[in-house]
Amino acid sequence: MVVAYKLSNGLEVILENGDITKVEADAIVNAANSYLSHGGGVALAIVRSGGYIIQEESDEYVRRNGPVPVGEVAVTTAGKLKARYVIHAVGPRYGIEGDDKLESAIRRSLEKADELKLSSIALPAISTGIYGYPYEICARIMSKVMKEYKPKFLKRILVVVYGDQAYSVFKKVFDNSLYMN
């Protein structure tokens, strides 16, 4: 299941139900924790598919720079994934940190892709796993950020969600918000 949206800022947004580790994009965004310890969910899947080098580079990043603040990002190579980079976005925990931190994590992921002069990025439903964010809130925030963003090099955003329920909610929100350009 795939649906595409063309935004007024020139971005093409593709919503897909699938495995983010299998998509082809210049960068894959990982839903990470502040210590970049990739022990579950999307993070574990990315390390399993891309190789342990991703975890090693993440550990080195934290050793050198300290924990990544909520709402911020860090970058590693992508190992064996069909991408050049993994952008590790630290999303908030629902009900603990605010929606502004989720908005920041998504926006910083797009900005980092532009800083790296990338044309495509794959985004998961950040913070909807163990961090408990409802799909609808994540989808609304994501659509807002994508519509407001002013891309430099970025042309395509693949929003890759896992499961029929997530896909259905994201599609409903995107149909209502991204077609209104």
From Swiss-Prot:
Domain of life (superkingdom): Archaea
InterPro entries xref list: Macro_dom, Macro_dom-like
SUPFAM superfamilies cross-referenced by the UniProt entry: Macro domain-like
Pfam families tied to this protein: Macro
UniProt xrefs under CDD domains: Macro_Af1521_BAL-like (cd02907)
Residue ranges annotated for the Macro domain, each copy included: 1-178
NCBIfam families assigned to the protein according to its UniProt record, in alphabetical order: PRK00431.2-3, PRK00431.2-4
Name of protein: Uncharacterized protein Saci_1252
Organism: Sulfolobus acidocaldarius (strain ATCC 33909 / DSM 639 / JCM 8929 / NBRC 15157 / NCIMB 11770)
